[in-house]
């Protein structure tokens, strides 16, 4: 199982959008995919239609080792499963902080699933927190979505700093798959000046890491999420190009 974490240290950077469409794209290619909602806001769980019952285990119980990880899986279909989250996940912060190995806890908890799935896609929270660090620490490949704006540039810089710090102490042993510009705005065939300037700045600070094709600003993403369908099903297959590029980089 190859684990891909979507992480960026600010809200509104496209982490959940990226995780959702990447996971579905991998499953559509016939891959067995585990998705993990590591954000207490639990947007990924909501978008995937997960309605938690009192008996359903979540990522919180997995991290605390209160349940076997296989018993936490919410099977969406034959190829797609989810470890969900809810507000209670925030209480895992103290556990991870006092565990002495918070950054590698999730990596260890997932080890029994190595042969059950081809890919794991993790939606990390936007804060520089224990939950974020254990999500990054679990990654073989890291995707950094960043809005094509000054806020997105700052988020990218902060995320790269975190990765560098974790790499120095070997808490992150994976690779950066790429930086994924989000909400790249175009007016017809002309890129908005703010987007153009932001992408140029991202290129300058990327430290040699690849800048992937942008997720364009479009209401069709919200429609696809709300309807639980692909962009291609809505007639906008061209908007899936960034994800096709990611799949190619992952060997799919």
From Swiss-Prot:
Inducing stimuli: Transcription is reproducibly circadian, under control of RpaA.
Subcellular location(s) of the protein: Cytoplasm; Cytoplasm, Nucleoid
Effect annotated for changing residue 15 to A/Q: McdA does not associate with nucleoid, no longer oscillates in the cell, Cbs aggregate and abut the nucleoid, cells elongate
Reported effect, residue 15 to R: Locks Cbs on the nucleoid which are partially aggregated and enriched mid-cell, still nucleoid-bound when mcdB is deleted, might bind better to McdB, cells elongate but grow slower
GO biological process, one term: carbon fixation
Chief location of this protein within or outside the cell: cytoplasm
Enzyme Commission designation: 3.6.4.-
Residues annotated as binding ATP 1: 11-12, 14-17, 41, 182, 216-218
SUPFAM superfamilies: P-loop containing nucleoside triphosphate hydrolases
A Pfam family reported for this protein in Swiss-Prot or TrEMBL: AAA_31
Residue positions binding Mg(2+): 16
Outcome (variant: residue 151 to A): Most McdA is diffuse in cytoplasm, a small amount is associated with irregularly spaced Cb aggregates which abut nucleoids, cells elongate
Quaternary context: Self-associates (probably a homodimer), interacts with McdB probably via the C-terminus of both proteins. Shows no signs of filament formation. Homodimerizes in the presence of ATP, making extra nucleotide contacts than with ADP or AMP-PNP. Each subunit binds 1 ATP molecule; Glu-147, Lys-151 and Arg-183 cross the dimer interface to contact ATP in the other subunit, while Phe-182, Arg-183 and Phe-221 stack with the adenine base in their own subunit.
Family under the similarity heading: Belongs to the ParA family. McdA subfamily.
Full protein name: Maintenance of carboxysome distribution protein A
Organism: Synechococcus elongatus (strain ATCC 33912 / PCC 7942 / FACHB-805)
């Amino acid at each position: 199982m190859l684990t891909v974490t979507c992480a960026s240290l600010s809200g509104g950077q496209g982490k959940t959008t990226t995780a959702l469409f990447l996971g579905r794209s991998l499953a559509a290619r016939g891959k067995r995919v585990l998705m993990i909602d590591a954000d207490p806001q639990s947007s990924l769980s909501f978008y995937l239609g997960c309605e938690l019952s009192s008996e359903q285990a979540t990522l919180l119980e997995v991290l605390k080792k209160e349940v076997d990880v296989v018993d936490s899986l919410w099977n969406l279909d034959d190829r797609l499963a989810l470890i969900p989250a809810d507000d209670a996940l925030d209480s895992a912060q103290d556990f991870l902080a006092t565990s002495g190995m918070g950054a590698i806890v999730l990596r260890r908890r997932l080890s029994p699933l190595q042969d059950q799935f081809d890919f794991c896609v993790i939606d990390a929270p936007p804060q520089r927190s224990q939950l974020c660090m254990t999500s990054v620490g679990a990654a073989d490949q890291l995707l950094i979505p960043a809005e094509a704006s000054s806020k997105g540039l700052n988020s990218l810089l902060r995320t790269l700093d975190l990765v560098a710090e974790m790499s120095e102490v070997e808490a992150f042993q994976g690779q950066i798959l790429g930086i994924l510009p989000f909400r790249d705005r175009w007016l017809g065939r002309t890129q908005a000046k703010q987007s153009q300037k932001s992408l140029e700045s991202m290129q300058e600070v990327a430290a040699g890491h690849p800048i992937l094709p942008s997720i364009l600003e479009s209401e069709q993403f919200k429609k696809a999420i709300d309807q639980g369908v692909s962009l291609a099903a809505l007639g906008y297959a061209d908007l899936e190009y960034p994800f096709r590029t990611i799949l190619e980089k992952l060997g799919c």
